[in-house]
Amino acid sequence: MIKLSVKEDCCGCGACLQRCPRHCIFFKEDKEGFLYPLVDESNCIDCGLCEKVCPVINRGECNEPLYVYAVKNRNERIRLNSSSGGVFYSLGKYVIQKGGVVFGAAYDDKWEVRHQKAESMDTLEPLMRSKYVQSRIGNTFVEVETFLKQGKLVLFTGTSCQILGLKNFLRHEYENLLTVDVICHGVPSPGVWRKFLMELTHLQSHKTALCEVAGKKTVLLSSPESISAITDINFREKEKYGWKKFGFVVLKKSVSKTGENSVLLSNIFSEDPY
């Protein structure tokens, strides 16, 4: 039965939940909004599969990189619409053109971050750009295994703990599986992200606030609308801020008195917000 001596060591990858043959594991948010596994002990058969797939308990081997490359997409539009150099788009396009499936993080209709699949170029675009929030993996490991057994080429992108969780879950090396680790130093919880968006979209009507955070200016432009008013979220806006500064932008349907439809424009994200 899955149990870590330090609860906070859990990365929330969901490998244990998806591998459990009795479906007796479920995830629940704690007071900080992070997802942690709980076990229905009355249904557990102590098979130990949940512990075998856990990337915290079974960290695997440390592999040394064979080669290191610096890469960027040649298409400027794709680079501007990406968080960095647009490499994910090229990898995803290659896999889809081969009849494969791409898995990555996307926003759902409530702007929460979830892993989902893309089998066409239209469905690939929502997976572009980094989302600096813990994603809900859902049942994607099971889906990946199904596609791999069908012989399809699969690309799975995620944080290092999610990738290791997937590989432990599969328990088999597949030549038709490509994985891309996103370098991660920790992310805010889904609960904190949800609360942030709710507070952001319920500020005083058309109020413009300018505050100083560690010497950096943050502009808030908002009206009292629900999260459904949001039309786009970009953690790395480049057309307005360029490549040197980090610009976090939330777009909404209505327009403020200043003529901007941006809820939040900020350049403080190159600093430690805490």
What are these regions (language model features)?
Residues 61-274:
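Iron-sulfur-associated redox domains of electron-transfer enzymes in respiratory
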Residues 5, 14-16, 26-28, 33, ...:
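Generic structural signal for short, flexible, solvent-exposed coil/loop and linker residues
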Residues 2-6, 15-32, 36-38, 48-65:
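Iron-sulfur cluster-binding cysteine motifs and their immediate structural context
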Residues 42-43:
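Short, charged amphipathic alpha-helical surface segments
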